[in-house]
Amino acid sequence: MKDILLITPPFTQLNTPYPATAYLKGFLNTKNISSFQIDLGIEVIIELFSKEQFTKVFAHAEQKNTILTDNSKRIFALKESYLNTLDAVIAFLQGNNATFARQICTDGFLPQASRFQQLDDLHWAFGEMGLHDKAKHLATLYLEDLSDFIVECVDANFGFSRYAERLGRSANSFDEIYDSLHKELTYIDQITLALLHEKIAKLQPKLVCFSVPFPGNLYSAFRCAQYIKKNFPNIKIAMGGGFANTELRSVSDKRVFEFFDFITLDDGELPIELLINSFSNNMAKMPLFKRTFLLQNNKVVYSNNCNKPDYKQSEVGTPDYTDLYLNKYISVIEIANPMHSLWSDGRWNKLTMAHGCYWGKCTFCDISLDYIKIYEPIAATLLVDRMEELISKTGENGFHFVDEAAPPSLMKALALEIIKRKLIVTWWTNIRFEKNFTADLCFLLKASGCIAVSGGLEVASDRLLKLIDKGVTVTQVAQVTRNFTKANIMVHSYLMYGYPTQTEQETIDSLEMVRQLFQIGVLQSGFWHQFALT
């Protein structure tokens, strides 16, 4: 029996756990509150993409007579080839049987459908000897073909890193999600709920907490909560996470609380501690809540009657990945982009250098939210203590610092502490392209194990950067990216188009500016996002 069950609902990343539950478990350890965490997403994926389960997928599609497109007919015709190779491909992408890469790269070994029509120039992307990455790329296309079959023939909501995302994106109204929750279970629902039942029956938690980071996790969180309410009615259920923090700050539809007892906002440590303490005290007459929505007298109320401040970052403990199946995550290479591979290939321990953003002025960012406006850096010595603890527990020495924007002064202190302790680590993070990233600092960061940074060039126009209050100029960005590149640190830039008042000519000029930055070699990766007001 555990006090708390922490759940990440399907789906997030394939290659590494989303860090929220590990952060919370690390904190709960400091309070001697027993907890267990599960990443339902990776568990569903591993169950689904197996020879045994996919045999059922093919049979289900045939029985329902949904194999209608040329692509799905081709995949079904090749089903024996898929079933004979599926378990071996998954094992390879989990880091087992490295020699299988040579077989995967053999022409005609893997069955191929429409995804292979988009095949990059493999020699350009991987060279003569990049067999392992080439094999991962081919195996990824193979899985994407099977994913297409699921979407076309079995469950249209499926996606590797999201499920029923469209429903989550319409969160201004609960009607569509509510209606979907009263329809027949989908194929993925059935797998998800079977795994959930097994965990809850074994652990018997007092409180189940769903961390919902993205719209593509929302439906599954509600479906799981619905199942718990029906089958384990004595268990209390809470929701938090990035989606709640941004989209549910003014929730008022009481139907939401048919599924969840509580919705907590912003940092989750203190709100969860108060919830579990109130259960232990049999819900005292005046229970204390921190930034929590609940139903009282058939009305949605927001309760924030606890005066205790949130815990300092030095007090929340080291993230704890115990309970998660770290050896089951799948490393994939979807496209031949070096930065994209950091997001999807390999397992990273995740840490935060500083809570919030030290700049906190960009006009496109919701700087009213606590996780952005409350800036609190963590001492470099404590950060490296946590890194050493995670290395000893996970066996992995790769770190992704998931800051909004890591501060240069703290990055310098971190690098010096890593070098002082003679640690061999690999790390990367998000930054602002500001002038404090001198050539000397970049070489120091490289010496400590920094391999990549990502930051926002946004609209690549000085007028618009000033309007955004980004605090940088295009010239400054070019100089800083040059400093990183000279130190052999890869640079990825987030780019934006369609910003209010941006003219057609400014858009063309920004494209040309980015092209030149790539041409001179100071940017190695970039991604354009269309500006959207939410």
What would you call each of these model-derived segments?
Residues L5-F11, L207, N234-A238, T246, ...:
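Conserved SAM/AdoMet-binding glycine-rich loop
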Residues F11-L14, P19-Q53, Y82-L131, L138-Y142, ...:
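Glycine-rich beta-alpha loop elements in corrinoid/cobalamin-binding modules
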Residues L28, C357, L383, G455:
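Conserved, mostly hydrophobic/aromatic
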Residues Q37-F49, A244-D253, M411, R463-I468, ...:
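Flexible glycine/acidic-rich beta-alpha junction loops that bind and position SAM and/or redox cofactors
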Residues I177, I188, K299-K350:
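N-terminal [4Fe-4S]-dependent radical SAM core
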Residues K229-I235, A284, I419-I424, F518-V522:
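Short helix-capping segments at alpha-helix termini
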Residues V251-S252, L441-C442, T501-Q516:
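Catalytic cores of alpha/beta
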Residues W343-T381:
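Canonical Radical SAM [4Fe-4S] cluster-binding loop centered on the CxxxCxxC motif
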